[in-house]
Amino acid sequence: MEVDADLELLTSLLEENEAAERNGVVSHEASSELDEFDELFDGDEDGSYHGSDNGTEEQTIGGVEEDFTTLFGDIDDIKEEEAAASDTKKQSSSVCQEKSKDELEDELRKMQAQMKKLQEQLQKTALAKTSSPGNPKKSPENKMVQSGKTSRTSPLIERKKTDSNTVAPQLTSPTVPKAKLPDAPKRKQNLSDKSPVQKKMASFLSPPEKSSARPGQSTATQPITNTLKSPVGQQYHVEKFSGLRIRKPRVSSSEMERKMNGRKLIRLAQLQNKIATEKLEEEDWVTFGVIVKKITPQSSNNGKTFSIWRLNDLKDLDKYISLFLFGDVHKEHWKTDQGTVIGLLNANPMKPKEGTDEVCLSVDNPQKVLLMGDAVDLGTCKARKKNGDPCTQMVNLNDCEYCQYHVQAQYKKVSSKRADLQSSYSGHVPKKMARGANGLRERLCQGGFHYGGVSSMAYAATLGSTTAPKKTVQSTLSNMVVRGAEAIALEARQKIAAAKNVVQTDEFKELMTLPTPGALNLKKHLSGVSPQANCGKEGQPIQSISASTLLKQQKQQMLNARKKRAEESQKRFLESTEKSEKSSTLTSSACSVFQSPKQGAEFPNAQKMATPKLGRGFAEGDDVLFFDISPPPAPKLSTSAEAKKLLAIQKLQAKGQTLAKTDPNSIKRKRGSSSEELVAQRVASHASTSPKSPDENEPAIKKHRDQLAYLESEEFQKILNAKSKHTGILKEAEVEIQEHYFDPLVKKEQLEEKMQSIREQSCRVVTCKTCKYTHFKPKETCVSENHDFHWHNGVKRFFKCPCGNRTISLDRLPKKHCSTCGLFKWERVGMLKEKTGPKLGGETLLPRGEEHGKFLNSLK
C-alpha cells in the first residue's frame, strides 16, 4: 500500500539523517501526511476524531498523530488503523536501513514535486486565506471560528496551507487533546455541482447563525423578555430593507446590499395581493418579518415533524402570515428564538385553511431562511386586563406601549391629570373616602408634620373619627313613633343643661386664670350671657341660625343702636338752643349774626339738620342786608401788638429810614446789587481754594480711548468670559427637568397618534336571528325569552359626518342618517377625534360674507 510505503520511508529518514537535515525531511513528511488524510476529510467532514498519545513511538510521529487526533476525535476505525500502522513501521524499520542514499534523494525529489503541485492547486482554487507564518499552531476553536467566517472552508484544507511553512515547529510542540466540539460546521456543497436555483439560493442566504457560532456556546432558546425589551440609552439604526430596528445584527448592511441586488422586495402587508395578481415564480423576491409566535412542533400523517411560525412586520399587528417548516428546514431552524427578524427567499405559497384568507408560506431549503437578528421594538402591552392579569397583546414599542384595546383607557387616565403634575393626584376626593380612614387627608398625613422646629401629630382628630361607631339598636314601638317639635326641643334643652353641669377640671381652671386673649374673651362671654337668654321661653322652640344670618342680625342691631343715640343727642341739642335764645338780650348788637352753640351742647354738627328760623339774632326794627358785597374787615390786632408796631415805626424814623411799600403786582423777588456781589465773591474764593486734578486738563477723546483700550484688554475679557465651574451640572439638571416635563407629553402624543391610526377594531358581538340585529350585547328580552342569538367575532368601525357628529358601526357603513344634520355622508376616521387648535385669521376671514346654500334663483 502507498500509505505503508510512505510511513516506512518517513521512519527511515527520521532515524538516519542528522539533526540539520531532519527538519527539512520533516517538512516534506508532514505535507505528505496531509495528502494522505484528504480522503478522510472528503469522506466525513463533520466528524471529529480524538486519540491518546503513544509514549513509546517517536516524538515526530506522535506529534503528527496527536495533531490529527485533536482535530477529529474518538473513532474506533482510526485507532485500528493507527495500530496497524505501528506494526508495519516496526517491520519495515530493518528494510529501510538497507536503502542507499541515492534512493532517498530520489524519493525526496518526488515528494518536493508533489508539494509544489499541491501548492499550485491551493492557489488556483483559493478556498481559504493563508494564515500568517508567525502563528506556530492554531487551536481547534480558532480554526472553527475562522472557518465559519470564510465561505465554508474546511478546517483540514486550511491546515494544509499553514503546515507547508510551519510543520517543523508543530511537530516539536505536541498539542493537548481537547474535548469534542459541540457545534461542528457542516460541509457545504460546491457551487459547480448545484442546480441554477441552488446557486441563486446560496448566493442570497447562507446560515448566518454559524458564522457567529462559538464552541461551548449554548444553543438553547433565550426567554422572550430579552428580545422584547430594549436597553435604555442605546440607539439602534433602522435596517434599510426590513424597516425594523435590529439588536445584535448577524448580517452587515453591505452584505445585505449585495444579497438584495437584482431581487424584488415585497412587504408582508402586500404579499396577499401580490400572490393573487402577479406570477412570483418567474422572478426572485424577498420578504422580511418578525417571529411573533411559535406553535409547538407537530407531527404529520407520515410521522414527520414540522413547525409553524407566525410572522408580522410590526406595522399591522392584527394581520400575520404563517410559515411552515418541514424536513431539513425544521431540523435546522426549529430552535430559532421568538422575536427574531428573518428574511425569506422565493417562499412557496400554500393553500389556506378553509374559511380563512390567511397567507401560508413554506420553504424547501434551510438556506432560503436568513436570520438577521433580534427585533428591538417587539413587546407586549403594559396594561392589565379586568381580571388583573397582564395583557398579552403584541405591540410595537417604537409606536406605543399599549395595545388598541387599552390605549383609550390609558389616554383617559393621562388626560385626567394636569400636564404639570403628571405624578400627583389632582382629582376630587369622594365623600365616602374622605370620611373613612382611606381619605386623602389620612393618606397624606401619615407621618406627621414638622414646622417651625415643632413636631405635631399627623392630623387632628375629626368628629367622624372620634365618635364611637353606632351600634345597631333593636327597633321598638317607641322608635317607630314620629316625635313632635316640642319633644325634640325638650330633648335639646336637656342636652344643654347636661352640658352646663359638666365638672370643670383643674387644668381648665389654670388655663382660665392666665391673662391670655382667649381666656379673657371666654370670661367676658360667659359673664355677659344670662341664663334666661340661654334657656329662652318655655313655649318657643330653639331655632338653629346660620352664621350669615347671625351676622346680619348683629349688624342691624348696631345700626338701630347708633340711630337711637343720634336721635337722643339731636333732641338734647335742640333743647339747649331754645334755652339759650330765651336768655339772650334783645339789645346785644355786638354779637355775631350767626351764633355758635354753647359749650354744653353735645351735638354741634346737627345744626344744619335743625329747622331754620328767619331773623335769628336780630331785634325788632333792625335792618337786614341780604346782599352785602363789601370786603370783609381786616382782623384787628390786640393792644400789645399795636403798641409794639408803633414802637418799631418810631425807631426807624429816628434813624431816617422808611419802609417801602410792596408792589402788589410783583411776581418775582428782585435781588439787590449787594447780594449779587456776595455771590460772585463766594464763587471766586471757592475756585481759588479747590486744586485742579490732572485728569480735568486732558481731552475727553483721550479718556474715551483709554476706556476702550481697557474694555479690549485681556484682563477685562477674562473677567467678562468667566463662567461658573458648575455650568455642566446646571445644564444636566435642566435637561433632567425638561425630560421630566416632556416625557408625559410625548407618551400622550404617542397615544393620540395610535388612536388616530386605529380605524377599525375587532370585537365580540352578538346577533339575534329572531329580532334581526347585531350589537355588542344582547337585549334583556332576548335573554329572558330565549331567542336564537349567538356570539361571534365582529369589526367595529368609526365614522364621522361633515357636521362633526361621530358614530360607530359594525357594518361596512352606518345604516342610519346623521342624527344632527340628517345627511348620509359618512367618512372613515380614527378612534380619537382630531383636535382642532385656534384658527388663523385667513381661515376665518370671509371676503364675500357668509356663503348660503340656496339662492333666490334656485327656487324657480
Curated annotation (Swiss-Prot):
Where does this polypeptide localize? Nucleus
Which segments show compositional bias classed as Polar residues? Answer: 120-134, 144-154, 164-175, 214-225
Region C-terminal domain, residue ranges: 596-860
Provide the residue span(s) of the region labelled Zinc finger-like 3.
801-821
**Residues annotated as region OB-fold domain?**
230-380
Query: What spans are recorded as compositionally biased (Basic and acidic residues)?
Result: 98-110, 565-582
What's an example GO BP annotation here? Answer: DNA damage response
InterPro entries from the UniProt entry: Mcm10, MCM10_OB, NA-bd_OB-fold, Rep_factor_Mcm10_C, Znf_Mcm10/DnaG, Znf_Mcm10_C
State the Pfam families in the record. Answer: Mcm10, MCM10_OB, zf-CCCH_Mcm10, zf-primase
GO terms assigned for molecular function = DNA replication origin binding; single-stranded DNA binding; zinc ion binding
Substituting K385E results in: 10-fold reduction in ssDNA binding affinity
User: Could you tell me which Gene3D superfamilies the record lists for this protein?
Assistant: Immunoglobulin FC, subunit C (1.20.5.420), Nucleic acid-binding proteins (2.40.50.140)
Query: Keyword Zinc on this protein?
Result: yes
Q: What's the entry's take on its domains?
A: Each zinc finger-like domain binds a zinc ion and is involved in both ssDNA and dsDNA binding, as is the OB-fold domain. The N-terminal domain mediates homodimerization.
* Subunit architecture: Self-associates.
Return the protein name.
Protein MCM10 homolog
**To which species is this protein native?**
Xenopus laevis
